[in-house]
Amino acid sequence: MITLITAVPGSGKTLYAIGLIEAALSEGRPVFTNISGLVKDKFSNPHLLSDAPDDWRDTPEGSLVVYDEAQQAHLYPSNAQRGPVTDERLTAMETHRHTGHDLVFITQAPTFVHHHIRKLVGLHIHLYRSRGLQAASKYEWSHVCDSPNDRKEQQRADFVLWKFPKEHFAFYTSAVMHTHKFKMPKKIGVLLVFVVLGLGAVGFNLYKNSGLASMAEATASVAEATPSPLALNGVKPSSLAAPYQWSAAAPAVPVSGCVANRSTNRCQCFDASGVVLAIEHAACLSVISSPLPRQLLSTSK
């Protein structure tokens, strides 16, 4: 199969190819590649890993050949020449399956490589890495997609979020892959600020309401524990709501007049009907000695 891998620098193209190379070496297949900075000792069967020649036909049958920066002039760059293709390396790709070869071309954009290769591609993989994440959106087509960043084309593709396999970082050196740091989008940052403020407001209200409830409970407890003055005097608080107050004491009667006999040391007071009233001796004398009329309440005998 002919596979095309496209993405801008730092998106994980080489890292993805490392996975293909390691899988092929694990199966015992010979692999040829021009990827620079490979640490061969990290791979399985490193003796099967060799540098790729400019002509893929110079590799044994059943080989996996991976060309990085395939648009380079000595490899398979795009050109505007019309008419029959004269490069035998390109025309031989039409029957590459007869020799069991798998060819992988890595570049930034599909239009960078020769149009004859684009016509023969059976798998196009496009990677898009956003804001320095340790992952990339992977889009796959069974043919070349000339506009892999077009939303409509991406909807037609098979999509998966591909997490960078950290175990493969040690297989090669990349000055771009490991220097990208995650940058949070401004919209997400503003949204997080509002979420934090909202959660803080909710928490404060809950704390405030719980504090008021605790104060109310404490006040109610103190009120229940402290007897009212009326209760101390033997009067129930519920009696305050009654429309009338009843008392066992005798009704008070106005004093109309008093008479004193000094020889017998007696003093009596009467109401308007002449009934003798029960009144203290001193109070009776006080009524006589003070000018009348005045009202003095007493109880009848």
UniProtKB/Swiss-Prot annotation:
UniProt: ATP binding residues: 7-14
GO molecular function annotations of the record: ATP binding
Membrane topology value: Single-pass membrane protein
Transmembrane intervals: 187-207
Coiled-coil stretches: none
Cystines in this chain: none
Record's GO cellular component terms: host cell membrane; membrane
Gene3D superfamilies tied to this protein: P-loop containing nucleotide triphosphate hydrolases
One Pfam entry name: Zot
Alphabetical list of InterPro entries matching this protein: P-loop_NTPase, Zot_N
Protein keywords: ATP-binding, Host membrane, Membrane, Nucleotide-binding, Transmembrane, Transmembrane helix
General function of this protein: May play a role in phage assembly.
More about this protein: The strain Nijmegen sequence is shown.
Protein name as it appears in the record: Putative assembly protein ORF301
Source species: Pseudomonas phage Pf3
